[in-house]
Amino acid sequence: MGTTIAGNPYLIQAAEYITPGLPYFAAIGIDDEDRHIRERVQTACETVGYAWPECRTTLLLLPTNQPKRPGLCALATAVCIMATAGTIGIPDLENTVILGDVEADGTIPPIGEDVDLTALIEHAREQGIQRVILPAADLAQAGRPDGVEIIGVENLNDLKR
């Protein structure tokens, strides 16, 4: 996923780990005031019919010391969790930037106009990213950069196999 600090774009790596244990969802690298993302993502995934893992689920957002905007990382969080179970119909997520929020009903709202999507996508392209997933409502703002596939989604179901 990507975000900006003072207008400078940078990428955030999202990694998901599912291990045996009691059901629990931990998010590392998110500020304490942004912890509500866990409940929103879990509710959204369950609403669209995804069975939440009955084990310990850990989301790691790197670098942990960089600030993250919850409105830009919730969709990436949901995609990571769904991908660990093989329910995502998009191959090679390692070369993909995922931007956006997710509502409790699974819909993907537009990214705020204060985010310079063109700069974020250009920075991602310069880092070798080949695909960007973002809200369908933001496709026009994203443009059509050379060498980057842009995928717009309206709902988490758009990503399921």
Model-identified regions with their sequence ranges:
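Peripheral, non-AAA+ core regions of ATP-driven protein-machinery
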Residues: 1-161
